[in-house]
């Protein structure tokens, strides 16, 4: 099948992250398509539309927008119709449903989700927490954590912690090291959600060898040894089972998928305590 080329114009009155993520999720369902993105952010006045319309003339394709101002949206929709450019407002279905269910009109505030409000500062605090509680640091401060991620080396603990932090969760993580007992005493007296991450030993060996090559580390031969890793995985699973912690196999999972699985377990855990 021949590869198709599609110009896609992503238009937003804020950072463009919302419309970009929607486009990314949808386009992932189509193969053999070469996507050329044209990003138009902070579009908030009629003057900003001139460059956009010129861009549509140069590279016609489709347009996805996240624009709150009704006048700007109307102008974009009218121009797109005249140019034969399909246009979709990605927020409309959800906003319309919420308007009906809640019985109130939207605020028409561009970039409303990025206001410097309490939730924003809570997310930033969560990021700071994840950084200062990475790889076993400050384990004595776990009483302030929402959750603890435990796993052997190279099971995506840090990136998963940071991803969840950007969702507002205070996450600590601990790396299991061969022949070093897990410091169980830090959990004494705490009602804390803990999840274990594991990986396929062969996959882990590949990842660790790649890391060693990148770091030019030839001293630790056991680090990527398949037998050593198999023992690490087995011992980690024993620890997880003995504590009754849920276990997630991150083999071939993206960080986003791992985080989603963690949140499923966390939600069920939290519901039993509400």
Feature names for model-found ranges:
Residues 39-67:
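Metallocofactor- and cofactor-centric catalytic cores in central/energy metabolism, strongly enriched
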Residues 171-182:
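Short beta-strand-centered segment that lines the nucleotide-binding/catalytic pocket of NTP-utilizing
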Residues 1-22, 26:
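N-terminal accessory targeting/assembly segments
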Residues 11-14, 65-70, 252:
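Structural motif
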Residues 81-122, 226-231, 238:
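Ser/Thr/Gly-rich flexible loops in soluble cytosolic domains mediating phosphotransfer, phosphorylation
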Residues 124-170:
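Internal active-site segments that recognize and position negatively charged phosphoryl groups
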Residues 191-208:
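Conserved phosphate-donor/acceptor-positioning beta-strand/loop module used by diverse small-molecule
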Residues 130-137, 210, 217-258:
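Small-molecule kinase domains that catalyze NTP-dependent phosphoryl transfer to phosphate-bearing small molecules
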């Amino acid at each position: 099948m021949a590869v198709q080329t599609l110009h896609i114009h992503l238009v937003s009155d804020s950072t463009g992250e919302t419309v970009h993520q929607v486009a990314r999720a949808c386009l992932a369902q189509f193969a053999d398509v070469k996507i050329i993105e044209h990003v138009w952010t902070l579009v908030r006045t009629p003057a900003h539309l001139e460059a956009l319309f010129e861009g549509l003339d140069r590279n016609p394709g489709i347009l996805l927008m996240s624009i709150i101002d009704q006048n700007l949206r109307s102008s974009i929709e009218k121009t797109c119709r005249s140019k034969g450019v399909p246009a979709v407002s990605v927020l409309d279905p959800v906003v319309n449903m919420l308007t009906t269910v809640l019985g109130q009109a939207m605020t028409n505030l561009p970039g409303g989700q990025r206001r410097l409000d309490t939730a924003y500062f809570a997310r930033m605090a969560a990021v700071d927490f994840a950084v200062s509680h990475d790889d076993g640091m400050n384990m004595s401060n776990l009483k302030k954590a929402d959750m603890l991620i435990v796993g052997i080396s190279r099971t995506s603990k840090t990136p998963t912690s940071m991803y969840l932090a950007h969702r507002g969760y205070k996450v600590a993580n601990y790396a299991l090291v061969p022949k070093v007992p897990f410091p169980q005493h830090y959990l004494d007296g705490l009602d804390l959600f803990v999840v274990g991450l594991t990986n396929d030993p062969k996959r882990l060996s590949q990842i660790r060898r790649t890391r060693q090559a990148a770091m030019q580390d030839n001293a630790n031969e056991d680090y990527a040894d398949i037998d050593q890793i198999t023992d690490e995985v087995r011992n980690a699973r024993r620890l997880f089972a003995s504590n009754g912690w849920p276990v997630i196999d991150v083999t071939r999972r993206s960080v986003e998928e791992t985080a989603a699985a963690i949140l499923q377990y966390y939600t069920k855990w939290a519901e039993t305590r509400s």
